A protein has these predicted regions:
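Active-site environment of divalent metal-dependent phosphoester hydrolases
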Residues: 73-75, 106-111, 132-142, 193-196, ...
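Divalent metal-coordination and catalytic microenvironments
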Residues: 69, 86, 98, 103, ...
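N-terminal Sec-pathway targeting helices
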Residues: 1-19
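Extended active-site neighborhood of metal-dependent phosphoesterases/phosphodiesterases
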Residues: 33-53, 116-231, 334-337
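N-terminal active-site segment of His-dependent metallophosphoesterases
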Residues: 29-116
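Binuclear metal-dependent phosphoesterase catalytic core
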Residues: 28-36, 40, 47-53, 172-178, ...
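Active-site-proximal beta-strand elements of phosphoester/diester hydrolases
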Residues: 61-74, 182-192, 239, 316-322
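His/acidic metal-ligating clusters that form di-metal
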Residues: 93-96, 184-186, 202-304
Length: 353
């Protein structure tokens, strides 16, 4: 064989390898999508108590283990340690429900991560209810595809929610005591990042988004719908990935000993290690919560090192203890207990044995 032919063969083999690797990379990197099933919310007339997800209260107390920011399959953090910590918390608390507070998985391979995360959650054998954080949006991931994969779980309680309002996965779970609603959980998508540009298309800055006006209207319709159905205001707990701006106001009022006009604030527990990274933009969610008088507790994550709980004008605003990004002895969650008289208590629970 001449040198020229040998060289041509080497080049051909090299090109075949490059083509093969390119196909593999395309398969791995290409985001997965699915058809969106249209479900339009048309105001209070769309409220249907029968369509709301439910879970039965089977003992005096109803306990929720809230975990957050697992960012499953992130190569920089140990899945084994996180899984062990969650299992330890389940063994300690015997929860009726696990709520995952967003950033459940992260990165360019979210379409694979969601499957591994869902498999892990199913292995615990406990009903679980997820919300989305900002990292589920990574690399333009299709949240409807991610939702479809999670809904293959045997133990999940989840609803994609209306498709004509902001966010994906805005839904309620009614905790049932016989035929009546004992308590209700409101789970909402606080969306991802917002980017601002100048007139020439240059990015000026970005900030984390929050619960938007269309979602607030949906929230109001559901709170009013629950009240009409039950003949009373139904007590609710809100879960979202990021805090409301009022948390920041309360924190600095307490830290700097500067009272807020017409507002009472109180420190409950925990530490603020990093600045509030959640929503700084005022969409009006707190005002609507205060007006309707149903939601007295809000739990959120996002800022990995914080576990502070404050009270702002009668509403507890509480960071869920981080589950995926801390050192082993700081991996944990937040245990929420609703007793038979509907009194709510919450505390940090650690994942070490």
């Amino acid at each position: 064989m001449s040198k020229m032919k040998r060289w041509q063969k080497v080049v051909a083999v090299f090109l075949v390898i490059v083509l093969f690797l390119g196909i593999v990379a395309l398969y791995l990197l290409c985001p997965r999508t699915t058809a969106k099933e249209v479900d339009n919310w048309l105001g209070e007339e769309s409220f249907d108590i029968q369509s709301i997800k439910t879970i039965d209260k089977t003992k005096d107390d109803f306990t929720i283990l809230a975990i957050t920011d697992i960012q499953f399959d992130n190569p920089f953090y140990s899945k084994k340690d996180v899984k062990t910590a969650i299992k330890n918390m389940i063994d300690k608390t015997n929860p009726d429900l696990i709520v995952t507070g967003g950033d459940n998985f992260a990165g360019i391979f979210n379409h694979f991560h969601v499957k591994a995360f869902t498999k892990m959650m199913d292995e615990f054998g406990v009903p679980w209810a997820p919300i989305f954080g900002n990292h589920e949006y990574d690399f333009h991931s299709d949240l409807y595809y991610l939702s479809k994969q999670m809904m293959k779980s045997e133990n999940i309680i989840f609803d994609v929610g209306p498709t004509n309002i902001d966010g994906v996965g805005n839904y309620l779970i009614n905790i049932m005591d016989g035929d009546s609603i004992f308590y209700s959980l409101v789970l909402m998508d606080s969306n991802a990042e917002v980017f601002r540009y100048d007139g020439r298309g240059n990015r000026l800055y970005s900030y984390y988004d929050g619960i938007r006006p269309s979602q607030i209207e949906w929230y109001e319709d559901n709170i009013n719908g629950l009240a009409k159905s039950e003949g009373r205001t139904v007590d609710t707990i809100l879960f979202s990935h990021t805090a409301l701006p009022q948390f920041n106001d309360a924190y600095y009022a307490i830290k700097n000993n500067t009272p807020l006009d017409g507002v009472s604030v109180k420190y409950n527990y925990g530490n603020m290690v990093e600045e509030l990274g959640g929503c700084r933009y005022e969409y009006g969610m707190y005002e609507k919560m205060a007006e309707l008088g149903s939601t007295k507790y809000h739990f959120f994550g996002h800022d990995h090192s914080n576990n502070t709980s404050l009270n702002y004008n009668g509403i507890d605003m509480t960071y869920i203890q981080n589950t995926g990004h801390n050192k082993d002895d700081q991996i944990g969650g937040t245990l929420i207990k609703i007793d038979s008289d509907k009194n709510v208590s919450h505390e940090i629970i650690m994942g070490n044995s």
